[in-house]
Swiss-Prot record:
Organism of this sequence: Yersinia pestis
Identification of the protein by name: Ribosomal large subunit pseudouridine synthase C
Protein EC: 5.4.99.24
A Gene Ontology molecular function term of the record: pseudouridine synthase activity
Similarity comment: Belongs to the pseudouridine synthase RluA family.
Enzyme type, top EC level: isomerase
GO biological processes: enzyme-directed rRNA pseudouridine synthesis
Catalytic activity as recorded in UniProt: uridine(955/2504/2580) in 23S rRNA = pseudouridine(955/2504/2580) in 23S rRNA
Domain S4 RNA-binding: 20-83
Keywords attached to this entry: Isomerase, RNA-binding, rRNA processing
Keyword set includes RNA-binding: yes
Length: 320
């Protein structure tokens, strides 16, 4: 066993940390400690706020003094972290923008945004290892594991609140590039179809169009046509799970190499292009800076595999 923090810590809550639940605060502070252990030390009174016992749902206030006891975690977890150091180092090359308030990353395909569900490494865990001095690092939004591109991370709670408000007001614009099956029809500029999320017996999440689902809208624009495929820009108005992927399928144009909603025959037509990952890339994000109010537009370049795929398709003659 290894001690996560070897002595009792007394932490004074700052204005930026105020407003969050004590359990969430401890999960962020005691990295690698299971949730069950967090709730156990709170329930047993080992964690105290202003010298008094509290419940897991207690919301911290500015100036609160939190007593955090020594917590022991398995050394096996430490070994797993060290084994991922190469991935952590690679994340440093993916940073597109960073200041005191936020960090913007070009997330690689195949990397989850969060560890869990059998995954020991995610982007947020990697960033916390890369920036151990950062007191606060939280995802503003999510990207599917196989989707690459712009991912926004808040470095202050005030920044997270501001950016979440922009998401709620739909003032943040996200633009994706997707390679879809067949010839996308020019008149199809938006898909409005309610989406319902189902959990299969295997635990896999599957989303489908259903009248019982939540209202969902994605806008589409043709970027380039090829013999068997179309490169489209997809801009989600709402932010449902797998929204672009399911809306593209609903339009009759599933995304290339989508192992959940795609067509294998289409994937086979792309043999020779070097593509073997989902062709969905968060290409650009426009938002207001949470501190300055400046309008920012961050773009993420395509990775080599996506870029080479498009070059191969162009060589096979672009459809005019």
């Amino acid at each position: 066993m290894k001690t996560n923090n070897p002595v009792v810590q007394l932490i004074t809550i700052s204005a930026d940390e105020a407003g969050q639940r004590i359990d969430n605060f401890l999960l962020a502070k005691l990295k690698g400690v299971p949730k069950s252990m967090i709730y156990r030390i709170v329930r047993k009174g080992e964690v105290r706020v202003n010298k008094g016992r509290i419940k897991p749902e207690y919301k911290l206030a500015d100036g609160d003094v939190v007593r955090v006891p020594p917590v022991r975690v398995a050394e096996r977890e430490e070994v797993q972290v060290s084994a991922k150091l190469d991935k952590v180092a690679a994340l440093a090359d993916c940073i597109l923008f960073e200041d005191d308030y936020l960090l913007v990353l070009n997330k690689p395909s195949g990397t989850a945004v969060h560890g869990g569900s059998g995954l020991s490494f995610g982007v947020i865990e990697g960033l916390r290892a890369l920036r151990p001095e950062a007191r606060f690092l939280e995802l503003v939004h999510r990207l599917d594991r196989d989707t690459s591109g712009v991912l926004l991370v808040a470095k202050k709670r005030s920044a997270l609140r501001s950016l979440h408000e922009q998401l709620r007001l739909k003032s943040m614009q996200k633009d994706y590039l997707a390679l879809v099956r067949g010839q996308w029809q020019s008149h199809c500029k938006a898909i409005q179809a309610p989406l319902l999320k189902n959990i299969m017996q295997s635990g896999e999440r599957v989303v489908k169009v259903s009248s019982e689902g939540k209202p969902s809208e994605t806008r589409f624009k043709i970027e380039e046509r090829f013999e068997h495929a179309t490169l489209v820009k997809a801009s989600p108005v709402t932010g449902r799970t797998h929204q672009i992927r399911v809306h593209a399928l609903h339009a009759g144009h599933p995304i290339a190499f989508d192992d959940r909603y795609g067509y294998r025959e289409f994937d086979q037509q792309l043999q020779g292009t070097g593509l073997h990952r989902l062709f969905l890339h968060a290409a650009a994000l426009r938002f207001e800076h949470p501190n300055t109010g400046e309008t920012m537009r961050i773009e993420a370049p395509l990775d080599n595999q996506l870029r080479h795929c498009l070059l191969a398709l162009r060589k096979n003659a672009t459809v005019k």
